Amino acid sequence: MAKNIQAIRGMNDYLPGETAIWQRIESTLKNVLGSYGYSEIRLPIVEQTPLFKRAIGEVTDVVEKEMYTFEDRNGDSLTLRPEGTAGCVRAGIEHGLLYNQEQRLWYIGPMFRHERPQKGRYRQFHQLGAEVFGLQGPDIDAELIMLTARWWRALGIAEHVSLELNSIGSLEARANYRDALVAFLEQHQETLDEDCKRRMYTNPLRVLDSKNPDVQALLNDAPALGDYLDDDSREHFAGLCKLLDAAGIAYTVNQRLVRGLDYYNRTVFEWVTNSLGSQGTVCAGGRYDGLVEQLGGRATPAVGFAMGLERLVLLVQAVNPEFIASPVVDIYLVAAGTETQSAAMTLAERLRDEMPDVKLITNHGGGNFKKQFARADKWGARIALVLGESEVANGTVVVKDLRSGEQTAVAQDSVAAHLRTLLG
């Protein structure tokens, strides 16, 4: 017998019960984005490899270790996208969306990184990202953070996430800080692990991200990034904090917070949780005012964020399971006998016209009442509609509440109104 072919490690199937959860969460996210005036952009999964090398930085873990890169039949180097910002900027430049314009965009879809799979971290994962172009003040940074805070309230997880902020300043300020940090680390190399020693010269700010407790203790005495900020970045960050204070959004300034991608400047932020173990970052972003020009466009201020949907789904399931406890099916239509099947399907179509948001399944494949009600239970239906020959003749249908067991005969012409009352 042929060996079964299974999914690639770290790339998961999401089955119908799971996709229903994803759809509800995604619908909530998209509704909030729409309320802020953001528009969807759809981007390719595969891009030219130089796009990510130029945008992310060649000495980052993503480019050095994690990208899925291959040659196509023309010999061109292509990469499965590891993140969405670079592709969004590329599309904006290519289609003339950015120069001298204000854009609020969002995208959603799979990303790919060759990492060690674990809970909340996969090789194919899904991100929702939002990017704003053409606005340089701290007010738009604040709007993005307010938008994410509204998500948490809508999903019922606001008490389980917290906001961390930092400013990493201008390119020049970071260069000065980098020199000071490297000088400090060189004096304490005996405390550094091999990964930090490698990063010390290639990307020293990433040492601040180290999870090694000895390195973290050492960093308590390291130069502080905030002491090296340029005046404009300091003023920008103060303006952001003032706006968040006015909006009642709590935050912690974390001077060790940097981003893993090279294109960020000034504001960086993360929403973190203690409810998912080691995978604590739910949403992260910041400003990247130089990236558009770096990729061949004209200088354009920009800010954005990305959120891992796998982690968000896990978090909602962990702390607010009621949000996702909606039934897969609202109504199951039981048809008693083959002679009633046509009438049942006609009634079902009429109900779908009158109640387009209701999930309704019509029984197919026959079966007695016991089997059909068992199918209704399996689907998690709240209500069963029972249509037999007498109901067809009388123009009625029996409506049974599968939770209380109560049932009543209702005229087919008025059953939609009756169902709306039962379903709330």
From Swiss-Prot:
Provide the reaction this enzyme catalyses: tRNA(His) + L-histidine + ATP = L-histidyl-tRNA(His) + AMP + diphosphate + H(+)
Top EC group: ligase
EC numbers, comma separated? 6.1.1.21
Q: Which UniProt keywords apply?
A: Aminoacyl-tRNA synthetase, ATP-binding, Cytoplasm, Ligase, Nucleotide-binding, Protein biosynthesis
Keyword flag Ligase: yes
A molecular function (GO) term = histidine-tRNA ligase activity
The protein's matches in Gene3D superfamilies, at most eight in alphabetical order, are given as: Anticodon-binding domain, Bira Bifunctional Protein, Domain 2
Where does this protein reside within or beyond the cell? Cytoplasm
GO cellular component, alphabetical, reads:
cytoplasm
**Major localization listed first in the record, in broad terms:** cytoplasm
Entry's Gene Ontology BP terms: histidyl-tRNA aminoacylation
Entries under HAMAP family matching the protein:
His_tRNA_synth
Q: Summarize the subunit comment.
A: Homodimer.
The record's comment on protein family reads: Belongs to the class-II aminoacyl-tRNA synthetase family.
Query: What is the recorded name of this protein?
Result: Histidine--tRNA ligase
Q: Which organism is it from?
A: Salmonella arizonae (strain ATCC BAA-731 / CDC346-86 / RSK2980)
